[in-house]
């Protein structure tokens, strides 16, 4: 059996403790991986797989990544579902030798990298939160706790098992913590649905008594009463989250703000299907482009962008909150010059939250200190812009949070250079004049370098070799270098008595002298001394910043609020949006409403302007349901979605794309539009539709807004009609909510005559010579046909198929009018015989074309030409 080397024995011991993670084992300038880790990482990273030695008679697979580029490789591995344990050298090889000639460099895991515990800019999306979530059940209660360790946000709320899916859809976390069996297995399908990595923890992590102690230690308090009254399940979820952070960060806990308790009735409830169907933050293809967020996001700071996405996912139901946000927008619109100045200052503001988090976890550097300095400088300028003005509450509060950092800003301004390096070990980030000991060490170091230049000139004259150079590398230090031709006389007396041979390369020979070695020692000592002073000063400055971390987090929140208010005001002004009226009623009256994403796309493509439409779903009591009929491609789905989006925008405190909008607060937003299957879970398109419809009928209350599109279309005609009919009746009688119901089942329109609160709407079209023109106007009334054949023709079906479809449709409609049996008709139709190809249809000519052919321009007077133009316009209608 092959003897295991001391280094490999150390590796195997560490790996055993982190069996479920890839081990990044530090060896000099590389992180090396061995055995199965190497095989998996090489495939995931597309890097070379090599071997190093043998273990139990087999070659040991090995691969590695350079330390300086490790972040990029880490990101790839995390995105592919791996967890990575980072094992660093805790001492230098020289220090290890002091313990014995055969001692292995001491190593230890300093961090476990998982999807929910990322902090580096390179591993995160600057404009999105990265939430770690813990779910706990204690007796009959359950709770959800979530934190973003890169910003310090920390929240908790009670949640029932049925409400877990909508909340996960709202938060879109990167990792979900649950207790091991049986909850882990029970929630695995849900986590898979949301594509969230699921991490099991032992029961001890979820112990609520231990959790309370953990939280008190974290916040250095004797009791949590100052933060609120927490249920046992809430304590359990928070405690598990803190315990996991302690495990992954190896005892270096992040700066978490005091936990904010949230209530279910605080925000509009939106389930996962509705978020997906409305494309709030991601399009159906999973991209940011094409989503509502991509169209309305005009924020200029990462913090403002994160706040916007958070608001979009959690529209408020609190009228005071909504009105405060709208008042802030009113102010920014009325004071457009001030708002523009604020946005200009905000553009220069770094990400304070994430800089603070890295400093707290000891992963920061001088640039994070500079980010705090620059951010505080901009905060001071922003507060000065608003000084002396009568401000609305939200903006006044945000500006007040930016003051009181004069001492810290002065310290950082004095201590740091303008553009510091990324890492403290690089040195050169402390400004001259800040520390006298540092200035002295630097002067000695720099003077020594000047002496080197003079020494090179002296040696060139002494040897008579004009091309002689003094150079430096990390192996030899300073050395004298000359060509092999010139080196001959330096290798022989008398010069050999002064110049000591060090190394010969292919083209060069290198020497040193006693004088040069002594000078190098002085320079090296001075340089090392200067770097040690800088590192000490870095620790001191970091400590000064972290002492004010809580206030800095509040200031960062204030900057984000200002960014979001000015961004939404800029959007409203540029897009001609209106201020919505939001109250506790069940009103829903929108005039000239538009779909923000579709309107944006039409404008970008240079197409026709968006056709605005009204929507009135107001109801004092009982249901208010609008039954929408009309052909495909007419804009029914767009109309449904735009009214849902207008509601959502109003309740995040934004202006809305309409001429006017009066909206009674919506408690729940449900959307059943579009068609998709779920092959992984064995669900057909129709089954998915029914599951989503069931959720709506079982959950919607009388303040909900429901939009339903084509219920029942995925099955046989009478089955589908029956389901749609019963669904509409249930919405009317039981849910008693506000709803838009689009359908091709024209039989449903008869319900408007029998059910109070149900009215018919239709999307107008115009027929001309067998073709259909979509007007995209929603009017009162019901459609009597769907124009499916015309839409098929527009889609490019072969002319023979379109013609055959017209024949079949005409005969089916005739049979229905005459009361004939459908089967007899079908038997008469040669449906399974191929129709012969039809000749291409003759091009249609309009009356205007005929008139144009009869015109002789040279024979017309100007007056006759003008009259003819009016006639042509009339004929073209």
Curated annotation (Swiss-Prot):
GO CC entries: cytosol
Keyword annotations from UniProtKB, A to Z: ATP-binding, DNA damage, DNA repair, DNA-binding, Nucleotide-binding
Entry-linked InterPro entries: DNA_mismatch_repair_MutS, DNA_mismatch_repair_MutS-lik_N, DNA_mismatch_repair_MutS/MSH, DNA_mismatch_repair_MutS_C, DNA_mismatch_repair_MutS_clamp, DNA_mismatch_repair_MutS_core, DNA_mismatch_repair_MutS_N, DNA_mismatch_repair_MutS_sf
Signal peptide residue numbers: none
Residue positions binding ATP: 630-637
PROSITE patterns with a match to the protein in the record: DNA_MISMATCH_REPAIR_2
Domain of life: Bacteria
SMART domains with a match to the protein in the record: MUTSac, MUTSd
Matches recorded under CDD domains: ABC_MutS1
Entry keyword Membrane: no
GO molecular function terms attached to this record: ATP binding; ATP-dependent DNA damage sensor activity; damaged DNA binding; mismatched DNA binding
Any matching Pfam family: MutS_II
One Gene Ontology term from the biological process aspect of the record: mismatch repair
NCBIfam families for the chain: mutS1, PRK05399.1
Function (record text): This protein is involved in the repair of mismatches in DNA. It is possible that it carries out the mismatch recognition step. This protein has a weak ATPase activity.
PANTHER family the record matches: DNA MISMATCH REPAIR PROTEIN MSH1, MITOCHONDRIAL (PTHR11361:SF34), DNA MISMATCH REPAIR PROTEIN MUTS FAMILY MEMBER (PTHR11361)
Name of this chain's protein: DNA mismatch repair protein MutS
Species per Swiss-Prot/TrEMBL record: Ruegeria pomeroyi (strain ATCC 700808 / DSM 15171 / DSS-3)
Gene name of the record: mutS
């Amino acid at each position: 059996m092959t003897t295991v080397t001391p280094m490999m024995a150390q590796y195997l011991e560490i790996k055993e403790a982190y069996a479920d993670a890839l081990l990044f084992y530090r060896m000099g300038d590389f992180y090396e991986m061995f055995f199965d880790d190497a095989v998996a990482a090489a495939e995931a990273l597309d890097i070379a797989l090599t071997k190093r030695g043998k273990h139990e008679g087999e070659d040991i697979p090995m691969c590695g990544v350079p330390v300086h580029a490790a972040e990029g490789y880490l990101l790839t591995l995390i995105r592919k579902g791996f967890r990575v344990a980072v094992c660093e050298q805790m001492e230098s090889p020289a220090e290890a030798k002091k313990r014995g000639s055969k001692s292995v460099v001491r190593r230890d895991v300093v961090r476990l990298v998982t999807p929910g515990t990322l902090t580096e800019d390179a591993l995160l999306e600057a404009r999105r939160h990265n939430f770690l979530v813990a779910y706990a059940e204690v007796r009959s209660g359950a709770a959800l706790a979530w934190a973003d360790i890169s910003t310090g946000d920390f929240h908790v709320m009670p949640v029932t098992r049925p409400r877990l899916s909508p909340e996960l859809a709202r938060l879109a976390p990167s990792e979900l913590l649950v207790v091991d069996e049986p909850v882990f297995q029970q929630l695995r399908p849900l986590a898979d649905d949301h594509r969230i990595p699921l991490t099991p923890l032992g029961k001890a992590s979820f112990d609520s008594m231990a959790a309370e102690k953990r939280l008190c230690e974290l916040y250095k308090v004797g009791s949590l009463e100052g933060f609120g009254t927490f249920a046992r399940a809430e304590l359990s979820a928070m405690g598990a989250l803190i315990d996991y952070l302690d495990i992954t960060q190896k005892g270096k806990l992040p700066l978490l703000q005091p936990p904010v308790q949230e209530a279910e009735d605080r925000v509009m409830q939106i389930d996962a299907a509705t978020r997906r169907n409305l494309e709030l933050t991601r399009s159906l293809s999973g991209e940011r482009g094409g989503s509502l967020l991509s169209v309305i996001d005009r924020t200029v700071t990462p913090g403002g962008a994160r706040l916007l996405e958070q608001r979009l996912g959690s529209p408020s139901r609190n009228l005071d909150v909504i009105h405060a946000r709208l008042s802030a927008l009113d102010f920014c619109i009325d004071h457009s010059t001030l708002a523009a100045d604020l946005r200009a200052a905000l553009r220069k503001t770094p990400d304070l939250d994430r800089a603070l988090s890295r400093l707290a976890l000891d992963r920061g550097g001088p640039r994070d200190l500079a980010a705090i300095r620059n951010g505080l400088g901009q905060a001071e300028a922003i507060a000065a812009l608003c000084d002396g003005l009568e401000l609305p509450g939200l903006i006044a509060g945000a500006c007040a949070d930016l003051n009181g950092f004069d001492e810290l800003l002065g310290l950082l301004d004095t201590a740091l250079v303008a553009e510091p390096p990324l890492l403290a070990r690089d040195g050169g980030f402390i400004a001259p004049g800040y520390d006298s000991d540092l200035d002295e060490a630097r002067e000695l170091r720099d003077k020594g370098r000047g002496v080197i230049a003079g020494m090179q000139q002296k040696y060139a004259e002494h040897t008579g070799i004009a091309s002689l150079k003094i150079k430096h590398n990390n192996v030899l230090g300073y050395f004298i270098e000359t060509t092999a031709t010139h080196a001959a006389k330096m290798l022989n007396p008398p010069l050999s008595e002064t110049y000591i041979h060090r190394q010969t390369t292919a083209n060069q020979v290198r020497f040193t002298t006693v004088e040069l070695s002594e000078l190098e020692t002085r320079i090296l000592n001075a340089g090392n001394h200067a770097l040690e002073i800088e590192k000490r000063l870095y620790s001191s400055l970091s400590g000064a910043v972290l002492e004010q971390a809580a206030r800095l987090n509040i200031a960062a929140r204030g900057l984000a609020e200002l960014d979001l208010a000015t961004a939404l005001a800029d959007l409203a002004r540029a897009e001609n949006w209106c201020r919505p009226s939001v109250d506790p009623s069940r009103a829903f009256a929108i005039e000239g409403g538009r779909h923000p994403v579709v309107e944006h796309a039409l404008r970008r493509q240079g197409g026709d302007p968006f056709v605005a439409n009204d929507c009135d779903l107001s109801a004092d009591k009982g249901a208010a349901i609008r039954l929408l009929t009309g052909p495909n491609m007419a804009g029914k789905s767009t109309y449904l979605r735009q009214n849902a989006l207008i509601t959502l925008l109003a309740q995040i405190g934004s202006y809305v794309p309409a001429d006017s909008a009066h909206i009674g607060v919506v408690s729940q937003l449900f959307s059943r539009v579009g068609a998709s299957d779920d092959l992984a879970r064995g669900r057909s398109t129709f089954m998915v539709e029914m599951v989503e419809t069931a959720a709506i009928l079982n959950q919607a209350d009388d303040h909900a807004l429901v939009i339903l599109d084509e219920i029942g279309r995925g099955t046989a005609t009478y089955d589908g009609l029956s389901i749609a009919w019963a669904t509409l009746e249930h919405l009317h009688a039981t849910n008693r909510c506000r709803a838009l119901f689009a359908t091709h089942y024209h039989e449903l329109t008869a319900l408007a005559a029998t059910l109070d609160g149900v009215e018919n709407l239709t999307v107008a079209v115009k027929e001309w010579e067998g073709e259909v023109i979509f007007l995209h106007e929603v009017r009162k009334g019901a459609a009597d046909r769907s124009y499916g054949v015309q839409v098929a023709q527009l889609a490019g079906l072969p002319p023979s198929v379109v013609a055959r479809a017209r024949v079949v449709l005409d005969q089916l409609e005739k049979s229905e009018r005459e009361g004939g049996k459908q089967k007899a008709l079908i038997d008469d139709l040669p449906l399974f015989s191929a129709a012969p190809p039809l000749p291409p249809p003759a091009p249609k000519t309009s009356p205007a074309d005929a008139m144009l052919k009869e015109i002789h321009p040279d024979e017309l007077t100007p007056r006759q030409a003008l009259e003819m133009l009016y006639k042509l316009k009339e004929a073209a209608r």
